[in-house]
Amino acid sequence: MGDMGDPPKKKRLISLCVGCGNQIHDQYILRVSPDLEWHAACLKCAECNQYLDESCTCFVRDGKTYCKRDYIRLYGIKCAKCSIGFSKNDFVMRARSKVYHIECFRCVACSRQLIPGDEFALREDGLFCRADHDVVERASLGAGDPLSPLHPARPLQMAAEPISARQPALRPHVHKQPEKTTRVRTVLNEKQLHTLRTCYAANPRPDALMKEQLVEMTGLSPRVIRVWFQNKRCKDKKRSIMMKQLQQQQPNDKTNIQGMTGTPMVAASPERHDGGLQANPVEVQSYQPPWKVLSDFALQSDIDQPAFQQLVNFSEGGPGSNSTGSEVASMSSQLPDTPNSMVASPIEA
């Protein structure tokens, strides 16, 4: 009965090593996401037998562990031409599900490097530029080997801009009906877009002559140019309709944020701040105390000034006065320079 009051003991979890299948009694357990546990001596690369710990990256595939180098070598994406892998800083060219280095993206017939905007065809034996693709197609038709209706002529594609090797590839669209060809999406480069936008700004509806000039300037097909102008006009029309709707809703549009209602405002241009004070301006003048004027007057060295001469004459001509100008000068030199030197003396009764 006494044992019933004891707290229940927690069940100890048992860790089993995925590598050897034995129980792990070590102090440290290496756990690989999500729930795989290993002995420190059992977690190693299946190819090079390098020990894997928390300081390196571990990859698991089909129950086997690999280091980063061997995993990329075995299962990483490789160039369809040279069969060499890509680094994280490489830019690649994609053609359907195949990936190429920029230097390897060449025609197999003439070895000309395909740049963004060039049309090419992807066949079983590699990439072909448009000229060599037409030669191969004419040769196959001239040899009396007509194409099967289930395998129509391969459509030409247009090379897009190079992208980073780390960017995931887009899944190609799969048609259920085999007799339909896949529509190729045309990707324009910056020079082609600049030419089309400049022409559109001058005339949104170019005539046939202008379209022919655009074909020569951009190297695009007439169909691509026609579709681009149609899409551009449609986008601008939708944008103008949306702007009109926003302008109509703006007078009645109010924003309510956490119970506070406000009217949207548009920031204007900055302007100079006038202050807007109601008080009148006050003119501030410098104030000079009287003792400073007297002290400056006494320290003047030029005795020929009229004010000083007048003071001397007054002292000489005054009744009962025997003082001279030198005495006046000596008395004036005894005047204090600053008010701090003035000390009040008691008055004798």
UniProtKB/Swiss-Prot annotation:
Induction: Down-regulated by beta-catenin/CTNNB1 in mesenchymal stem cells (at protein level). The down-regulation probably proceeds through ubiquitination by WWP1 E3 ubiquitin ligase and protein degradation. GO terms for biological process: atrial septum morphogenesis; axon regeneration; canonical Wnt signaling pathway; cardiac cell fate determination; cardiac muscle cell myoblast differentiation; cardiac right ventricle morphogenesis; cell population proliferation; cellular response to glucocorticoid stimulus. Keywords: Activator, Developmental protein, Differentiation, DNA-binding, Homeobox, LIM domain, Metal-binding, Nucleus, Phosphoprotein, Repeat, Transcription, Transcription regulation, Ubl conjugation, Zinc. Residues 262-291 are annotated as: LIM-binding domain (LID). Residues 17-70, 79-133 form the LIM zinc-binding domain. Residues 181-240 bind DNA. Ubiquitinated probably by WWP1 E3 ubiquitin ligase; ubiquitination is followed by protein degradation. Isoform 1 is phosphorylated. SUPFAM superfamilies: Glucocorticoid receptor-like (DNA-binding domain), Homeodomain-like. Transmembrane segments: none annotated. CDD domains: homeodomain, LIM1_Isl, LIM2_Isl. Disruption phenotype: Embryonic mutants exhibit growth retardation at approximately 9.5 dpc and die at approximately 10.5 dpc. Between 9.0 dpc and 9.5 dpc hearts are severely abnormal, appear misshapen and unlooped. Hearts are completely missing the outflow tract, right ventricle, and much of the atria. Conditional mutants for retina expression show a decrease in several gene expression levels involved in the differentiation of retinal ganglion cells (RGC). Residues 312-349 are annotated as: Disordered. The keyword Nucleus applies. InterPro entries: HD, Homeobox_CS, Homeodomain-like_sf, ISL1/2-like, ISL1/2-like_LIM1, Znf_LIM. GO terms for cellular component: chromatin; cytoplasm; nucleoplasm; nucleus; transcription regulator complex. GO terms for molecular function: bHLH transcription factor binding; chromatin binding; core promoter sequence-specific DNA binding; DNA binding; DNA-binding transcription activator activity, RNA polymerase II-specific; LIM domain binding; metal ion binding; nuclear estrogen receptor binding. Pfam families: Homeodomain, LIM. Residues 321-343 have a biased composition (Polar residues). The keyword Disulfide bond does not apply. DNA-binding transcriptional activator. Recognizes and binds to the consensus octamer binding site 5'-ATAATTAA-3' in promoter of target genes. Plays a fundamental role in the gene regulatory network essential for retinal ganglion cell (RGC) differentiation. Cooperates with the transcription factor POU4F2 to achieve maximal levels of expression of RGC target genes and RGC fate specification in the developing retina. Involved in the specification of motor neurons in cooperation with LHX3 and LDB1. Binds to insulin gene enhancer sequences. Essential for heart development. At neuronal promoters, displaces LDB1 from LHX3 LIM domain to form a ternary complex in which ISL1 contacts both LHX3 and LDB1; allosteric structural changes in the DNA binding domain of LHX3, induced by the ISL1:LHX3 interaction, may explain differences in sequence specificity of the different complexes. Interacts with LHX3. Interacts (via C-terminus) with POU4F2 (via C-terminus) isoform 1. Interacts with POU3F2. Interacts with POU4F3. Interacts (via N-terminal domain) with MLIP; the interaction represses ISL1 transactivator activity. Interacts with GCN5/KAT2A. This is Insulin gene enhancer protein ISL-1. It comes from Mus musculus. The gene is Isl1.
